[in-house]
């Protein structure tokens, strides 16, 4: 953990950060002030910290390495003259695995926030300081002591309750005990509003987390591989889709939501969730070769079709990123096509009923 982020991942993280900012400017015509980012423990292990590097870079902070190695011994502020853009406020939603595995990185991220908050810079180039000053003022009016208000205003790392895992959304969708996106957003906020840092471990701060969500203009999740996509695991929609629903619930509007890919460290790519969904739909879900490959696996292959439909629906329920043509094409290929439907029914009757 003390070799994260590595020098190599720092380069990738800077590239991811620059491309995220560029894409948002392209979409909205302005630089983002507040970003909500997902951090997975497994991805952190695989990449040696691409996500951590990006978060630090967005805040305008970089690692200090020992001599020529990758051992991180501290952080330093990137001067504004070198950064050439404002310091962006980043809220991090970590997974349970990350919480358990990387407490040292939680403290590193906390240190980054502390460094930036102490800078004598105008608020228009330091959005972390801007948000903290506003929040401290609000908390003082609510009766908090100054030291406590300052402490709360620096909270940026959040996750599920200690000893638990997940995002609270998947269970709700599968149980059908929900009616609106707001229900899903509230569930995500309730499950994710536990702050982590050097002096607190899972403290429930739902009001504070809701404020962070309300200000978030962007949600982003990075990938380091092309071997799995966002329609292959329910983790994707429960964590990222749930995050989108939480921002919508807290702010009343949808954030710009992106999926970045750093499988080629020399050429990272970023797409909106809608663009990524459309790409997966055309390249895999509707590709005859995919279904033919599933047929070799009988019962399990038919189950994969049903699982795909569940995940697709989960994304639409949380993020409303599906388009009508996608539902039409899935129905046409797997339900209305008699040959395909009968194969699924023969190999796994429960799968075809669930898809219906």
Feature roles, as predicted:
Residues 1-356:
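Ligand/cofactor-recognition surfaces for anionic moieties
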């Amino acid at each position: 953990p003390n070799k994260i982020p590595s020098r190599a991942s720092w380069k990738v993280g800077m590239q991811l950060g620059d491309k995220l900012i560029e894409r948002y400017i392209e979409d909205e015509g302005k630089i983002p002030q507040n970003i909500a980012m997902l951090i997975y423990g497994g991805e952190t292990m695989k990449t040696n910290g691409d996500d951590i590097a990006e978060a630090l870079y967005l805040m305008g902070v970089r690692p200090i390495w020992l001599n020529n190695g990758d051992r991180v011994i501290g952080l330093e502020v990137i001067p504004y003259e070198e950064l050439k853009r404002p310091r962006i406020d980043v809220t991090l939603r970590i997974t349970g695995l990350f919480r358990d595995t990387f407490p040292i990185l939680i403290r590193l991220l906390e240190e980054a926030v502390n460094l930036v908050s102490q800078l004598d810079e105008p608020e228009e180039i330091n959005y972390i300081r801007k948000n903290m000053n506003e929040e401290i003022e609000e908390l003082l009016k609510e009766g908090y002591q100054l030291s406590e208000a300052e402490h709360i205003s620096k909270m940026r790392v959040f996750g599920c309750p200690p000893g638990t895992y997940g995002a609270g959304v998947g269970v709700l969708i599968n149980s059908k005990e929900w009616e609106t996106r707001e229900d899903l957003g509230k569930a995500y906020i309730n499950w994710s509003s536990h702050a982590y840092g050097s002096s607190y471990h899972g403290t429930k701060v739902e009001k504070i987390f809701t404020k962070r969500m309300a200000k978030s203009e962007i949600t982003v999740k990075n990938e380091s591989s092309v071997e799995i996509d966002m329609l292959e695991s329910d983790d994707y929609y429960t964590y990222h889709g749930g995050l989108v629903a939480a921002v919508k619930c807290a702010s009343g509007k949808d954030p710009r939501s992106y999926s970045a890919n750093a499988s080629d460290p020399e050429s990272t790519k970023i797409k909106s969730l809608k663009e990524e969904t459309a790409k997966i739909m055309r390249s895999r879900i509707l590709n005859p070769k995919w279904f033919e490959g599933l047929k070799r696996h009988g019962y399990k292959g038919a189950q994969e079709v049903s699982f795909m439909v569940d995940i697709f629906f989960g994304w639409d329920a949380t993020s409303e990123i599906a388009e009508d043509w996608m539902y039409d094409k899935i129905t046409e290929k797997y339900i209305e096509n008699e040959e395909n439907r009968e194969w699924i029914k023969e190999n796994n009757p429960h799968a075809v009923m669930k898809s219906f």
